[in-house]
Amino acid sequence: MIRISVDVMGGDYGPEATIAGAAIVQKHLPNVYFLFYGVDEAVKPVLKKYPCLASLSRFCSTESYTRMDEKPSQALRNGRGRSSMWYAIEAVKNGEADACISAGNTGALMAMSYFCLKMMAEAERPGIAGIWPTLRSESVVLDIGATIGASASQLVDLAVMGAGMFRTLYHTEKPSVGLLNVGVEEVKGLYAIKKAGMILREVQLEGLEYKGFVEGNDIGKGIVDVVVTEGFSGNIALKTAEGTARQIGEILNAAMRSSFFSSLGYFLSRGAFRTLRHKMDPDRVNGGVLLGLNGVVIKSHGSANASGFASAIRVAYEMVSNGLLKKITADLRRFHENKEKLFDKESEPTINNGETI
């Protein structure tokens, strides 16, 4: 039985989406047990709607929950030992749960997870990895917003962790990895990116195949399985892609309603449009993974509906059942055993100061 703790209060729709999402998963994955954390008056009425969860879940009442507009430091100070998000994370630390999921405040989730679970000894810094729909299938992109800036060593860490996540989700022996850069030529880019590329190219780390630099317009093509960048660039790329997808949808909707013949054309092509909508649906690939921590923590989109939250639960299930943490720990250990040989002894320049978003 895989145990998953859920911050029921997180996200735009709260218990209505999170508990309903758990009920969807229960139909297909009966070997999952849920620990629901939330405020009594908000959770209990919703739980009554899903008797199918009665024997496969436990509700744990909390004093408060983390608001979406709270700063990470404020959320940590106010929520420690009180909020539904904190208790869901702490359940992983205490061994009561194998993974934690929240659709709540990203900064707060990152801060609480870092404070409660601590970093893997083998990892320098956490990263958030997201699943990105592409022309081929899906790619893993990281870091999409855990921290700003990265050294060459930290970028290699992200490559190792991202490849481990891709192997876990898609059962590919050696995922292809690319570093996001301003060009594909080896002479382009900041020092940290070029240095990380040199290391990945020369060392040939087990468990991944380095393909070189990729540009922003390559992400959606799916030319590599894993795209690695620091959190500032990654977050901008993510938000740009999401905004572009929404804009295309709005333009298409307006165009299809502009005339009788446009509407007729849509009617005749509706199968193709359904395929496009399914491919680009953010709920289908919902579930960012916080990598580098001593535990599995999944961040769902705050706007996710029940179906989207169910997708995030399935990601957590795959991470646990396929041993994500063991794979990443072993891969990082192999890299760091040779780290002194790979990097210059002087301090590495970083892309910037490594601030937290």
Curated annotation (Swiss-Prot):
Gene3D superfamilies: Isopropylmalate Dehydrogenase. NCBIfam families: plsX. The gene is plsX. The keyword Membrane does not apply. Pfam families: FA_synthesis (PF02504). HAMAP family: PlsX (MF_00019). It comes from the Bacteria. It catalyses: a fatty acyl-[ACP] + phosphate = an acyl phosphate + holo-[ACP]. Belongs to the PlsX family. It is found in: Cytoplasm. InterPro entries: FA_synthesis (IPR003664), Phospholipid_synth_PlsX-like (IPR012281). Pathway: Lipid metabolism; phospholipid metabolism. Coiled coil: none annotated. Its EC number is 2.3.1.274. This is Phosphate acyltransferase. GO terms for cellular component: cytoplasm. Keywords: Cytoplasm, Lipid biosynthesis, Lipid metabolism, Phospholipid biosynthesis, Phospholipid metabolism, Transferase. GO terms for molecular function: phosphate:acyl-[acyl carrier protein] acyltransferase activity. Homodimer. Probably interacts with PlsY. Catalyzes the reversible formation of acyl-phosphate (acyl-PO(4)) from acyl-[acyl-carrier-protein] (acyl-ACP). This enzyme utilizes acyl-ACP as fatty acyl donor, but not acyl-CoA. One of its GO terms (biological process) is fatty acid biosynthetic process.
